[in-house]
Amino acid sequence: MSDGDEPAVGDRLDALHEQLAATAERPVARAASAHLGEAEAVARDLAERPADPDTVRERVGHVVRLLREAGDTEDERADEHVAAALELAEGLIAELADSDGEST
């Protein structure tokens, strides 16, 4: 796969943040709200501040854990944003892990 096949990591971090920021506009369950808010804050920080690949992978992994722990949002559109964010985050982790493993 060439570099032109997928958006740059920075663009996908922006998209991750946008998906999570969109959940803040939705009437989500209180129990899910704290997890989503923390995940959105981590994603915002990643989108705004450059970091080395290991740090990005670690922090995106934290986003994934938070999203999985969020539970039911009780809002279908928020669930769609969470699913899209999870897909983006898991893809980023896989890509960053693959780039680490290329030398092995």
Regions found by a protein language model. Name each.
Residues 1-104:
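Acidic, polar-rich N-terminal leader regions of halophilic archaeal proteins
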